[in-house]
Amino acid sequence: MGSEMCIRDRYFIAAKLLREAGEGPSIIVSPLLALMRNQVEAAARAGIRAATINSANMTQWEEIQADVDKLDLLLISPERLNAPGFREEVLPQLARSVGMLVVDEAHCISDWGHDFRPDYRRISLLIDDLPANTPVLATTATANDRVVADVVAQLGEGTGVLRGGLDRESLSLNVVRLADPTQRAAWIAQYLAQVEGSGIIYCLTVAACLLYTSDAAD
């Protein structure tokens, strides 16, 4: 989480600086709706104008597309990016003026990756349509050597690779043994009251998700 936030903050800053230099909005390709919402909220807190186009806000697409020149960042799912209507009607205008292209969760490009998304493979077609010297950044925290090589091959010749270490002081793994769902819900509620920021709670069932969501809201 800490590493991801550092990367995100850097391309937020880069997008803002590019806009101030007269470039167009930056495009971030992201595979997860929750992640896109989180990034839009984080951008707003940083004073950066951002919006997202995905399957959860279809009624807002036309409004967002009409006002795209007013944005610093546009977050979009790979499936929407490759939809015929979007590619033919919206993408050409964006490609002509895009400040930067960011491919988030770039391991999804590789069919060797654990979370392969076919539409990510088509991002290379978008890169071919971008003006020369348009910055392209691909980020991931889960790529082995084979996946990195595949991503580089998809992005094109001249792609540079920067890799950080795997020992991250900001991450820890703990196991807490609790007897039943009631105790787990109580522990989560107590823990949430002690920490700041955002996070994700993974559950095995929809019922558990609803239970913990209700407790967290209270």
Regions found by a protein language model. Name each.
Residues 29-33, 53-57, 166:
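A short hydrophobic beta-strand->loop->alpha-helix junction that borders the nucleotide-binding pocket
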